[in-house]
Amino acid sequence: MAVSDPIADFLNRIKNGQKARFDKVDIPASRMKASLSRILKEEGYIKNFKLIKDDKQGIIRVQIKYGEHREGAITGIKRVSRPGCRVYVGHDEIPRVMNGMGIGIVSTSKGIMTDRQARKEGIGGELLCSIW
């Protein structure tokens, strides 16, 4: 069965894997999910990710990051723009997540980037999700 919201599926697999204390989670690959994984790694929310080729679309293997007491690096994830209700924001309307303690991920004309990068470059776009 096809997934109606692949980004929400990506975020939920990471969240559920962290709650179940898995070391890694396998997710069906796409370019957008690879970009999201790259941002999560750069911001320190996941340890690493690896693209694995297979006969179909490929797999992204995400290594989940934990603290010294096995608490997850991700406290919360919220999907903002959904297929049924898209949310677009200008560069001056991008909200700060947890007063700057979290990140917002924005899909812009220059690619997928964090809320800080979008504000710095002065471009808005679709607000995909918030992570803290």
UniProtKB/Swiss-Prot annotation:
- Tell me if Phosphoprotein is a UniProt keyword of this record: no
UniProt GO cellular component terms: ribonucleoprotein complex; ribosome
Q: List the disulfide bonds.
A: none
Please give the biological process terms from Gene Ontology that the record holds: translation
- Which keywords fit this entry according to its UniProt record? Ribonucleoprotein, Ribosomal protein, RNA-binding, rRNA-binding
**What domain of life does the UniProt record list for this protein's source?**
Bacteria
Q: Which GO terms describe its molecular function?
A: rRNA binding; structural constituent of ribosome
Record family assignment: Belongs to the universal ribosomal protein uS8 family.
Job description of the protein = One of the primary rRNA binding proteins, it binds directly to 16S rRNA central domain where it helps coordinate assembly of the platform of the 30S subunit.
Q: What is this protein called?
A: Small ribosomal subunit protein uS8
Gene name tied to this protein: rpsH
